[in-house]
């Protein structure tokens, strides 16, 4: 049963091309490309697709539809109201102005509360997707569980405690 579900998740398609392009545009504005890599190298858009498909069940409260797709709808509505165009057709400057209004929980505009909650989900997934990828880990310069060079306790500290290393340790 689980293998059938995995196959469905891998082979199925949740978002259409416009939606995937919109997610890509959002992600590249939230976390712009740098010399270490970008959203595409990290597979962030693919992560959205996998999560949307895998969590689109009643057990997950139809997360893909009610949260991820709903976010795209809400962001498009705001852009349509402000600029007369869907998000994908807006300039980066226009989109950033929308994100500035919905990026923080301290905005008390009642009309933006849903967008604020949905943007928090998007931002979290973008950051998680990037920084858990090979590109993001390199960007962090994460070294993992690698030992440092350690030459022991400094001599002045050893003298303070009147101790020393045995010769065979040195």
What are these regions (language model features)?
Residues 7-9, 25, 36-170:
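Mature-region segments of soluble proteins
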Residues 32-34:
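Short amphipathic, basic-aromatic surface patches that mediate peripheral association
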Residues 1-25:
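C-terminal segment of N-terminal export signals and the immediately downstream linker at the start
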């Amino acid at each position: 049963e689980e293998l059938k579900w995995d196959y469905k998740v891998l082979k199925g398609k949740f978002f259409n091309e416009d939606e995937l392009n919109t997610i890509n545009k959002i992600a590249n504005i939230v976390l712009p490309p740098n010399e270490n890599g970008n959203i595409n190298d990290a597979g962030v858009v693919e992560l959205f697709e996998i999560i949307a498909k895998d969590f689109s069940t009643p057990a997950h409260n139809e997360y893909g539809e009610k949260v991820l797709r709903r976010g795209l709808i809400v962001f498009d509505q705001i852009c349509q109201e402000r600029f007369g165009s869907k998000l994908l057709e807006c300039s980066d400057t226009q989109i950033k102005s929308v994100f500035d209004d919905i990026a923080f929980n301290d905005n008390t505009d009642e009309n933006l509360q849903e967008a604020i909650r949905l943007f928090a989900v998007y931002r979290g997934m973008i950051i998680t997707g990037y920084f858990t990828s090979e590109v993001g880990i390199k960007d962090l310069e994460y070294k993992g569980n690698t030992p440092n060079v350690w030459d022991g306790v400094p001599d002045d500290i050893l003298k303070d405690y009147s101790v020393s290393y045995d010769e065979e340790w040195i």
